């Protein structure tokens, strides 16, 4: 193939120039582009300075705008426009280029248009400022305290009334199972999610039941809660009265014991006086009296020692048994116990709020 092409080229170079066939003539109607592509020599172009385009789309854009999209064509177009002295058409980049048939610009008209544009921009700025009100720096803050008055005419509006008038509210709180307790205090702030902040709060609550007692325990209600609280208060009063009675009995017993000790000391003093008086008694009688008193004291001490030893042994055994039993037994937990406490301030989440009503 290469040899044939070389031979054709050498033959063409040696032979005189022939007129191109109509199939290879670009200006003829019978032009065959496929044959021109595979021809050994490029067909002659009647316009040597014609621009070259990469594709058909670039050629179509050149026909619409008169400016080539590529850098080479753009530079060539600029150079051609500068050389010919004809102003170029406006390009796609937005640069102002006058067409050949466009009239000369009027400077007075341009000045009038600029003045109108400036006045319009100033008017639009004033209107926007009037609509927006104060600027961003002067914008009123938006927070929970500013949003609370906007809930007038709704249940949240009643909460805002309680804040203004200082009315106490009762907030019923729940756990994962049911009612937990009641918080009574003064409302300070709230939001649309029923999150609340209270001060000077008195809470009555019961700890949640866990473990196996959770399955057996019945649901807590307000009546059960406050009935249990009353029962605890009454039992506490009874325990206090019993402790007062025991304290009074102990004080009486201590008084009687002091009286007995005083009487014993008095008897001892009288015995000493009689002993002094009995010095005049004969020595034989004194010796017999001493022996009798010693025998009586020894008998009493043996009895008391035996009884004390037996008593201490029996008490020790009972105490050891009681301690072992206490160790085996688990401490009993009262799940129904109700607690009360006072809190200076508290935050309650809205998901834990069951009911809110005014305190009587």
From Swiss-Prot:
Gene3D superfamilies noted in UniProt: 2.30.30.100
Keyword Phosphoprotein: yes
An annotated GO BP: positive regulation of G1/S transition of mitotic cell cycle
Keyword RNA-binding: yes
Region annotation Disordered: where it falls in the sequence: 1-29, 68-143, 268-333
Gene Ontology MF terms: U7 snRNA binding
Glycyl lysine isopeptide (Lys-Gly) (interchain with G-Cter in SUMO2), cross-linked positions: 120
Biased composition (Low complexity): 78-94
Tree of life domain: Eukaryota
Residues modified as Omega-N-methylarginine: 41
Key words, A-Z: Aicardi-Goutieres syndrome, Disease variant, Isopeptide bond, Methylation, mRNA processing, Nucleus, Phosphoprotein, Repeat, Ribonucleoprotein, RNA-binding, Ubl conjugation
Sequence segments annotated as region (SM 2): 343-356
Phosphoserine: modified positions: 15, 21, 154, 280
Polar residues: compositionally biased ranges: 299-322
Broad class of the protein's primary localization: nucleus
Recorded GO CC terms: histone pre-mRNA 3'end processing complex; nuclear body; nucleoplasm; nucleus; telomerase holoenzyme complex; U7 snRNP
Localization annotation: Nucleus
Region span, SM 1: 171-204
Illness: Aicardi-Goutieres syndrome 8: A form of Aicardi-Goutieres syndrome, a genetically heterogeneous disease characterized by cerebral atrophy, leukoencephalopathy, intracranial calcifications, chronic cerebrospinal fluid (CSF) lymphocytosis, increased CSF alpha-interferon, and negative serologic investigations for common prenatal infection. Clinical features as thrombocytopenia, hepatosplenomegaly and elevated hepatic transaminases along with intermittent fever may erroneously suggest an infective process.
Assembly notes: Component of the heptameric ring U7 snRNP complex, or U7 Sm protein core complex, at least composed of LSM10, LSM11, SNRPB, SNRPD3, SNRPE, SNRPF, SNRPG and U7 snRNA. Formation of the U7 snRNP is an ATP-dependent process mediated by a specialized SMN complex containing at least the Sm protein core complex and additionally, the U7-specific LSM10 and LSM11 proteins. Identified in a histone pre-mRNA complex, at least composed of ERI1, LSM11, SLBP, SNRPB, SYNCRIP and YBX1. Interacts (via the Sm domains) with CLNS1A. Interacts with SMN and ZNF473. Interacts with PRMT5 and WDR77.
Name of the protein: U7 snRNA-associated Sm-like protein LSm11
């Amino acid at each position: 193939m290469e040899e044939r092409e070389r031979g054709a080229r050498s033959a063409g170079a040696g032979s005189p120039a022939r007129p191109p066939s109509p199939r290879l003539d670009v200006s003829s109607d019978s032009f065959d582009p496929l044959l021109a592509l595979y021809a050994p020599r490029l067909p002659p172009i009647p316009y040597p300075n014609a621009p070259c385009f990469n594709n058909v789309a670039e050629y179509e854009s050149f026909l619409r705008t008169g400016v080539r999209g590529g850098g080479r064509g753009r530079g060539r177009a600029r150079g051609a426009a500068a050389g010919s002295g004809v102003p170029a058409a406006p390009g796609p980049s937005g640069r102002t280029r006058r067409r050949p048939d466009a009239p000369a610009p009027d400077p007075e008209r341009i000045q009038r248009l600029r003045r109108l544009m400036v006045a319009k921009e100033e008017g639009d700025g004033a209107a926007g400022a009037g609509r927006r009100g104060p600027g961003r720096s002067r914008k009123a803050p938006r927070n929970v305290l500013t949003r609370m008055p906007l809930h007038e005419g709704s249940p949240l509006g009643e909460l805002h009334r309680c804040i203004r008038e200082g009315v106490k509210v009762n907030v019923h709180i729940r756990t994962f199972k049911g009612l937990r307790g009641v918080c009574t205090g003064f409302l300070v702030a709230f939001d649309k999610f029923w999150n609340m902040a209270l001060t000077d709060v008195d809470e009555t609550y019961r700890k949640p039941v866990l473990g196996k007692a959770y399955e057996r325990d019945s649901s807590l209600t307000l009546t059960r809660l406050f009935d249990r609280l009353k029962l605890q208060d009454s039992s506490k009063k009874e325990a206090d009265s019993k402790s007062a009675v025991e304290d009074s009995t102990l004080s009486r017993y201590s008084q009687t014991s002091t009286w007995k000790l005083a009487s014993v000391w008095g008897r001892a003093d009288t015995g000493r006086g009689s002993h002094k008086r009995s010095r005049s008694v004969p020595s034989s009688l004194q010796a017999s009296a001493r022996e009798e008193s010693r025998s009586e004291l020894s008998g009493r001490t043996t009895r008391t020692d035996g009884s004390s030893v037996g008593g201490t042994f029996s008490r020790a055994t009972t105490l050891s048994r009681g301690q072992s039993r206490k160790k085996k037994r688990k401490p009993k937990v009262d799940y129904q116990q109700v607690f009360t406490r006072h809190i200076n301030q508290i935050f309650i989440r809205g998901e834990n709020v069951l009911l809110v009503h005014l305190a009587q």
